[in-house]
UniProtKB/Swiss-Prot annotation:
The gene is hisH. CDD domains: GATase1_IGP_Synthase. The keyword Transmembrane does not apply. Heterodimer of HisH and HisF. Pathway: Amino-acid biosynthesis; L-histidine biosynthesis; L-histidine from 5-phospho-alpha-D-ribose 1-diphosphate: step 5/9. One of its GO terms (cellular component) is cytoplasm. This is Imidazole glycerol phosphate synthase subunit HisH. IGPS catalyzes the conversion of PRFAR and glutamine to IGP, AICAR and glutamate. The HisH subunit catalyzes the hydrolysis of glutamine to glutamate and ammonia as part of the synthesis of IGP and AICAR. The resulting ammonia molecule is channeled to the active site of HisF. It is found in: Cytoplasm. InterPro entries: Class_I_gatase-like, GATASE, Imidazole-glycPsynth_HisH. Keywords: Amino-acid biosynthesis, Cytoplasm, Glutamine amidotransferase, Histidine biosynthesis, Hydrolase, Lyase.
Length: 192
């Protein structure tokens, strides 16, 4: 079972619809007894990092997610950023599952990074356009599987142990985005 974590700031209905379209059983919840049953946990998100972490803590989801670190967790957009240690957006601590700091995009191009952009990767399936909406980015590191070029290199997919972060919106990136979401659910992008 896949559980989409509901903390009140997310693109939940679109993500749920996309996962159902792929044929998976999916439940939306913020309850420990449901999250504990998940094989895969999806952390969606749209909005401000500090506000999201405040809600996650208010709902005790930080502790619940910390008890489920043996499971695959996929963060989408803000959800990816929340898995990091810290963000400059609101100077807030994250969940700390992936090492690094989230920082504002530094580019001569307009911010937010909004619209379609091509993925760059050594992975054979990660080479098409996907849909981005964000103003902050993860650091470039050995955990980056694919990135986009937007006046600077912006991590688009990261994988660290059983944590997968997807900065763009796979649920808004057409058939190709669904293929990426399926690959993330099935095991990720390392050692393919």
């Amino acid at each position: 079972m896949i559980v989409i974590v509901d903390y009140g700031l997310g693109n939940i209905s679109n993500v749920k619809r996309a996962i159902e379209h792929l044929g998976y059983e999916v439940v939306v919840s913020n309850k420990q007894n449901i999250i504990d049953q998940a094989e895969t946990i999806i952390l969606p998100g749209v909005g401000h990092f500090k506000d999201a972490m405040s809600e996650i803590k208010r709902l005790n989801l930080d502790a619940i997610l910390a008890k489920n670190t043996d499971k695959k967790m996929i963060g989408i957009c803000l959800g990816m950023q929340l898995m990091y240690e810290h963000s400059d957006e609101g100077d807030a601590s994250g969940l700390g599952f992936i090492p690094g700091n989230i920082s504002r995009i530094q580019t001569e191009y307009p911010v937010p990074h909004l619209g379609w952009n091509n993925l760059v990767s050594k992975h054979p399936m990660l080479n098409q356009d996907v849909y981005f909406v964000h103003s902050y980015q993860a650091p470039m590191s050995e955990n980056v599987i694919a990135y986009a070029q937007y006046g600077t290199d912006i991590p688009a997919i990261v994988q660290f142990n059983n944590y997968i972060g997807i900065q763009f919106h796979p649920e808004k990136s057409g058939t190709y985005g669904l293929q990426i979401l399926r690959q993330a659910i099935q095991g990720g992008f390392i050692n393919d």
